[in-house]
């Protein structure tokens, strides 16, 4: 039942996860090749290329590594926000 509700919510959502164009932009901004990024992810250039084209869903562990590599939030990569970095405030 819960899975059905989640699917329905995602189908009705205006947010579309369009991470693949951002992956390429971030990589190019970092002056890196697909092969270099793939090596950091311990995967092949072919697999990474599929992430950038949207032909393959990126695993969470790769998403986290890329966010750290590029200094952006995972939400930015996923297209859920246009703010690259999450502001962290210290509380006392």
Where are the language model's segments positioned?
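Short, charged recognition helix plus adjacent turn
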Residues: 1-15, 78-92
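DNA major-groove recognition helix of helix-turn-helix
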Residues: 52, 70, 81
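Short basic helix-loop element that most often maps to the first helix and adjoining turn
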Residues: 21-40, 65, 90
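Conserved hydrophobic/aromatic packing and binding residues within compact polymer-binding modules
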Residues: 23, 37-38, 48-51, 77
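Hydrophobic side chains within well-formed alpha-helices
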Residues: 19, 23, 73-74
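DNA major-groove recognition helix of helix-turn-helix/homeodomain DNA-binding modules
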Residues: 42, 61-76
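Recognition helix of helix-turn-helix/homeodomain-like DNA-binding domains
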Residues: 41-57
